[in-house]
């Protein structure tokens, strides 16, 4: 994917918002009570697309300050079906990622959306989006990283292949690098053992030929 394509994706999704100082409590702040029960219980498997999504937030420093990424991953194919990038970690970050996933996938009613107990995922706005699209919320336990291990594995790959490869002077250049890696490398070039050595896009195309999933 050309850099101009990555710029277009960022522009179309409104990821060039004005930057401001981070406010409120961070992701590592003490988790609050769950809004949903843990329906996944570390069973990160799905018989088809849009049955189980995982979501979480990661952050990385730039010369201008931190940049936050919220991603939504379909367990069936390991594809990142929605994501949002911003300079502030507010509930809107998680809401935009979930809305992007719904817009891309279409028929998602009944899909379980699993997260940790971060305030962004317990927010009224996020819970409202779940209800509006007939999605089923699920939350892991406090301090149990393994409860969302399949999502953390994606962030570990992102950190190794993008975030820690160099220092980033601006948020814009890191945004471009993240979008390019997800859309060009992770989705279309990186073969995964659990997908029979196929990429996420190949796996969905081959295993679900009758389903018109966006590429």
Question: What is each residue range found by the language model?
Answer:
Residues 1-215:
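Charged DNA-binding/catalytic regions of mobile-element recombinases
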């Amino acid at each position: 994917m050309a850099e101009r394509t990555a710029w277009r994706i960022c522009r179309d999704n409104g990821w060039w918002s004005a930057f401001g100082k981070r406010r409120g409590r961070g992701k590592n702040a003490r988790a609050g009570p769950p809004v949903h029960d843990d329906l996944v219980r570390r069973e990160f498997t799905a018989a088809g697309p849009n049955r189980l999504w995982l979501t979480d937030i990661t952050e990385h420093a730039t010369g201008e300050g931190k940049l936050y990424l919220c991603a939504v991953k379909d367990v069936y194919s390991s594809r990142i079906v929605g994501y949002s990038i911003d300079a502030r970690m507010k509930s809107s970050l998680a809401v935009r990622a979930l809305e992007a996933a719904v817009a891309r996938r279409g028929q998602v009613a009944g899909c379980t959306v699993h997260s940790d107990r971060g305030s962004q995922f317990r927010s009224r706005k996020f819970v409202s989006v779940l209800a509006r699209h007939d999605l089923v919320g699920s939350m892991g336990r406090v301090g149990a990283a393994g409860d969302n291990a399949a999502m953390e594995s994606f962030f570990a790959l992102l950190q190794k292949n993008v975030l820690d490869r160099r220092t980033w002077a601006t948020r814009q250049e890191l945004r471009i690098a993240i979008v390019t890696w997800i859309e060009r490398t992770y989705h279309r070039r990186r073969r995964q053992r659990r997908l029979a050595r196929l990429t996420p896009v190949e796996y969905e195309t081959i295993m679900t030929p009758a389903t018109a999933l966006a590429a």
